[in-house]
Regions:
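Residues embedded in well-ordered beta-strands within globular domains across many folds
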Residues: 77, 131-134
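Canonical radical SAM enzyme core domain
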Residues: 47-63, 85-127, 132
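P-loop/Walker A phosphate-binding loop and immediately adjacent motor/lid segment at beta-alpha junctions
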Residues: 86-100, 143-161
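N-terminal [4Fe-4S]-dependent radical SAM core
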Residues: 1-29, 38, 42-49
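Active-site beta-loop-alpha junctions enriched in small/polar residues
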Residues: 81, 113-115, 138
Length: 161
C-alpha cells in the first residue's frame, strides 16, 4: 500500500446509486471539507480524520463495481466532504487515473465547494480527469429543492468533456 492510501478517509461508499448523477453509479463520499457550509447535509464529513481510511481494497472494489456487467454503472460520483480538499488530491487523482485506464466509457461526476476558476494547479490536474464538475459552496439562502444535482442556485454544473 502506498502513502496515498493513508491520505484519504471516506464516510460512505454506495456500489449502486441513482441519485448522485445520471444513471446507475458508484458513489464515494470522502472526508474533509474546509467550506463548512451552513445547512450542509453532510456535516459529519467535514473533518479529514472522520470516517475510515480508504484502502487499496476499497479502491479495487470501486474498479470492480464499475466493471461489473450484471449491474452496469454509467460512472463514478465523488462527493463528500470535498474531493478537492488539498489533502485528498493525491488519493483522488490515483483513483481517477485507474478509472480512466481500467473502466473505459465510464463518466465521473464530482461535487466541490471550490469554484472552477479558483482551483489550484493540483486541483486542476484532478479535474482534468473528470467529466462533470458541480462547483460552489452550498448557500442556505439560495437553496432550491427544484434544482437537479445542485442544492443552491449559485452552484454551477460544468460539463467538461
Amino acid at each position: 500500500m502506498g502513502n496515498w492510501v493513508k491520505a484519504l478517509n471516506f464516510h460512505q461508499y454506495y456500489s449502486v446509486d441513482v441519485v448522485n448523477g445520471p444513471g446507475t453509479r458508484c458513489v464515494l463520499f470522502v472526508s474533509g471539507c474546509v467550506h463548512e457550509c451552513r445547512g450542509c447535509y453532510n456535516k459529519s464529513t467535514w473533518r479529514l480524520d472522520s470516517g475510515k481510511p480508504f484502502t487499496q481494497q476499497d479502491e479495487d472494489k470501486i474498479i470492480a463495481d464499475l466493471q461489473d456487467e450484471l449491474i452496469p454503472r454509467q460512472g463514478l460520483t465523488l462527493s463528500g466532504g470535498d474531493p478537492l480538499h488539498p489533502q485528498n488530491l493525491s488519493a483522488v487523482r490515483h483513483l481517477l487515473e485507474r478509472v480512466r485506464a481500467e473502466c473505459l466509457g465510464k463518466n465521473v461526476w464530482m461535487w466541490t465547494g471550490y469554484k472552477l476558476d479558483e482551483l489550484t494547479v493540483d486541483q486542476q490536474q484532478v479535474v482534468e480527469l473528470i467529466n462533470v464538475l458541480v462547483d460552489g459552496k452550498f448557500v442556505q439562502e439560495l437553496k432550491d429543492p427544484a434544482l437537479i444535482w445542485r442544492g443552491s442556485s449559485n452552484q454551477v454544473i460544468h460539463y467538461l468533456r
